[in-house]
């Protein structure tokens, strides 16, 4: 008897219909005619001196538009890949799309009118989405609360745990490299120095400890002074450091931020003024220190004069997290996607400074944007170098926001919240782009890939998810953890993702 297959389900029919209509769209003939296109820089809103071009509809593909734009900007010999948006960052043209099928045929524009296409440069390298667990390593005896990759490459990752230890993992072999003991309470924060030569840790015992990540040995004495637990750590940007004297900022529930001379083993200065728990500290590339607090404010300090510059007010509840548009380049200093390390100290300093200035310069000015995430379910975008007034307030989350982060190229902003969602925003003006829906529990943390094309998120639902930033769709679902995932990091070289949580296992993910 011949095998009989069951009839297709409604879902299969729907998918088949969608696929056939998609194929029909792609094969439909592009009519004769042309369209006028104006290119506008998405970052500055300026069209520079670029002329309006009349382009045949049949030739108006993203590939050809890339070639045209590079020629107009005299970059033919050293082409940059660009992404194009129509009217707002919500309508990105796909890498293989054309203006006719993306805009004219759906009725978004008429071929008779001038079409404004915003452009944003993309990374010249491409990161692949992690899709499998390469290693699940046991060792910690309690919840894993923090993980961070070395800025140098993805071969080493540090983790901090409720078992009072800091561990460094060899991600190439999936084995532990060092176990650092000394803390007498939960380790809540770990942070590599920008040149990857030192590792800082802090937590419930109110002490900051500095470690040599190559040997696993402690450097100097514990840094003592805080009267309550430490909430976050941030190193002074490499290009601002005095040679051989790196400094570290630590924030605490005691309401203060302390700046430490880690080699001298002493406090440099203390910043007090908050009336509640200081939840996060960031050290900007111009020397400003940014702090958020449960007193509903953000304070901006000058690290040179050790004084308060601004108090930023606007949130109606605790401020849980901060992010700077330059976080990625400050974290990685002179390390970039090429893997080439400058030979001399002067060259390292120059490269770190030029990477920061390139990332922060808009219209010839250094612009460092700040995003603040609050318990009041909103995010506020600021330009704190020039004004204490907010650029915009972003609303949409239904519950408190845990985490906020900028993409490495500074064009996108992602927020993770207790409403089970990650939301994506334009980092220029705060416009809402996408809601990333798939998690079924609160999302604790999110991080971008080095090329800004992908985002990973970790949740109470025990999973990691990887998202495509162009479409806002989920690219990979990564189950494996047996309990909540608290900590997540994507290596600066884009090769690996590290995660940890309540199941006490460090997991290393890769393509």
Predicted feature locations:
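A structural motif specific to WD40 beta-propellers
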Residues: 132-135, 175-178, 217-221, 266-269, ...
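WD40-repeat beta-propellers
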Residues: 147, 166-169, 190, 202, ...
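Conserved strand-to-loop turn within each blade of WD40 beta-propeller repeats
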Residues: 159-163, 201-205, 213, 250-254, ...
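WD40/WD-repeat beta-propeller blade N-cap
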Residues: 137-144, 181-187, 223-230, 272-278, ...
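Intrinsically disordered, low-complexity acidic/Ser/Thr/Pro-rich linker and tail segments
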Residues: 2-46, 54-145, 154-155, 327-368
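C-terminal interaction modules of eukaryotic adaptor/scaffold proteins
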Residues: 425-431, 439, 449-450, 456-511
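Loop/turn segments within WD40 beta-propeller blades
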Residues: 148-154, 173, 190-197, 215, ...
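A conserved positional marker within WD40/Gbeta-like beta-propeller blades
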Residues: 165, 207, 227, 256, ...
């Amino acid at each position: 008897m011949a095998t009989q297959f069951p009839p297709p389900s409604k879902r299969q029919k729907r998918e088949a219909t969608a696929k056939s209509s998609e194929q029909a769209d792609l094969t439909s003939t592009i009519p004769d005619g042309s369209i006028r296109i104006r290119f506008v820089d998405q970052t500055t809103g300026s069209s520079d001196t670029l002329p309006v071009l009349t382009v045949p509809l049949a030739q108006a593909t993203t590939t050809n538009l890339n070639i045209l734009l590079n020629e107009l900007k005299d970059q033919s010999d050293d082409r940059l890949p660009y992404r194009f948006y129509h009217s707002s960052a919500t309508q990105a043209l796909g890498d293989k799309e054309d203006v006719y099928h993306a805009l004219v045929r759906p009725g978004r524009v008429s071929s008779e009118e001038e079409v404004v296409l915003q452009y944003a440069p993309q990374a010249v390298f491409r990161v692949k989405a992690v899709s499998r667990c390469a290693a699940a390593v046991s060792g910690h005896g309690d919840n894993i609360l923090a993980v961070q990759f070395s800025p140098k490459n993805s071969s080493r990752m540090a983790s901090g745990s409720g078992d009072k230890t800091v561990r460094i993992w060899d991600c190439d072999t999936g084995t532990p490299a060092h176990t650092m003991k000394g803390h007498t309470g939960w380790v809540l924060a770990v942070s590599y120095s920008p040149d990857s030569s030192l590792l800082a840790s802090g937590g419930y015992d109110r002490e900051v400890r500095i470690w040599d990540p190559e040997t696993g040995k402690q450097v100097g004495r514990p840094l003592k002074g805080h009267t309550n637990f430490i909430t976050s750590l941030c190193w002074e940007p490499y290009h601002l450091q005095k040679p051989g004297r790196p400094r570290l900022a630590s924030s605490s529930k005691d309401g203060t931020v302390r700046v430490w001379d880690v080699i001298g083993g002493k406090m440099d200065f203390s910043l007090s003024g908050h009336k509640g728990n200081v939840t996060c500290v960031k050290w900007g590339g111009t020397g400003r220190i940014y702090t958020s607090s449960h007193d509903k404010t953000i304070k901006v300090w000058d690290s040179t004069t050790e004084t308060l510059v601004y108090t930023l007010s606007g949130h109606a509840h605790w401020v849980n997290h901060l992010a700077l548009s330059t976080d990625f380049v400050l974290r990685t200093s002179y390390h970039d996607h090429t893997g080439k390390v400058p030979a001399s100290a002067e060259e390292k300093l120059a490269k770190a400074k030029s990477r920061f200035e390139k990332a922060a310069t808009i219209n010839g000015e250094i612009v460092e944007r700040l995003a603040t995430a609050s318990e009041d379910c909103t995010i506020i975008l600021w330009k704190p170098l020039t004004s204490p007034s907010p650029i915009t307030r972003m609303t949409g989350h239904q519950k408190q926001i845990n985490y906020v982060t900028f993409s490495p190229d500074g064009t996108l902003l992602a927020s993770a919240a207790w409403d089970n969602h990650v939301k994506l925003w334009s980092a220029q003006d705060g416009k809402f782009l996408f809601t990333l829906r798939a998690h079924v529990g609160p999302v604790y943390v999110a991080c971008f890939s080095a090329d800004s094309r992908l985002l990973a998120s970790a949740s109470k639902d025990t999973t990691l998810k990887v998202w495509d930033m162009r479409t806002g769709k989920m690219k990979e679902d990564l189950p494996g953890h047996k309990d909540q995932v608290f900590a997540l990091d994507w290596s600066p070289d884009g090769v690996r993702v590290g995660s940890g949580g309540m199941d006490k296992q460090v997991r290393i993910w890769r393509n």
